């Protein structure tokens, strides 16, 4: 079970993708007090975990029984969103800027907790991990990934200050390319599952 938890936590961490959250923190650090940014990070990750917990426990019921959405369709949608985010990072060397708020904590739930932390890719992963390994592995892996994400975001408050903006832009573009590849793979996997499902019914 330990190996399943660790591999699942790695998958969830990739789906959450702390890299763009770290960039967000560096941008917010320039305009807001560091203590406010810390509070934002903690609140956003708690909210993000609770959202993923809901989908890990009851996501299949919510999606398939209520909305009649198949997991493969969600994989395609999540992959498309990831591909789009990666493409934006690759082209611009940055992420879409968030409209400034007078109260930074207003950003904790939306857009930081969702869709940045608990986005389509992470939600898909939570549901898929529950289906494949069970609720204990899925929730534990999600918790580990969220803790790592929160720690990286908090550390970036201090580490990102000395990084050259040009180097940061290049790094973001490279990360964007990998995000695009992950998104493309998710879309291919989801589309393949949809095709197989259609062939079985035919």
Curated annotation (Swiss-Prot):
It holds the Pfam family MarC. The chain crosses the membrane at residues 5-25, 47-67, 76-96, 104-124, 135-155, 174-194. The keyword Nucleotide-binding does not apply. The keyword Ribonucleoprotein does not apply. GO terms for cellular component: plasma membrane. It is found in: Cell membrane. It comes from the Archaea. It is a multi-pass membrane protein. Belongs to the UPF0056 (MarC) family. This is UPF0056 membrane protein PYRAB02000. It comes from Pyrococcus abyssi (strain GE5 / Orsay). The lineage of its organism: Archaea, Methanobacteriati, Methanobacteriota, Thermococci, Thermococcales.
């Amino acid at each position: 079970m330990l190996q399943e938890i660790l591999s699942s936590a790695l998958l969830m961490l990739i789906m959450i993708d702390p890299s763009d959250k770290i960039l967000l923190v560096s941008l917010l650090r320039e305009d807001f007090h560091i203590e406010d940014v810390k509070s934002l990070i903690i609140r956003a990750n708690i909210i993000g975990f609770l959202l993923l917990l809901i989908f890990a426990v009851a996501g299949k019921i919510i999606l398939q029984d209520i909305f009649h959405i198949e997991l493969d369709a969600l994989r395609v949608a999540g992959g498309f969103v990831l591909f789009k985010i990666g493409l934006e990072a690759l082209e611009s060397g940055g992420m879409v800027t968030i409209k400034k708020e007078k109260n930074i904590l207003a950003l904790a739930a939306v857009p930081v907790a969702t869709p940045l932390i608990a986005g389509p890719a992470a939600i898909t992963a939570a549901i898929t991990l529950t289906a494949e390994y069970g609720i204990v592995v899925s929730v534990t892996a999600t918790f580990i990934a969220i803790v790592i994400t929160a720690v990286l975001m908090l550390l970036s408050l201090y580490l990102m200050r000395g990084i050259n903006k040009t180097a940061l832009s290049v790094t973001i573009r490279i990360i964007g390319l990998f995000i695009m590849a992950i998104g493309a793979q998710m879309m291919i996997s989801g589309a393949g599952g949809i095709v197989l499902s259609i062939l079985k019914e035919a």
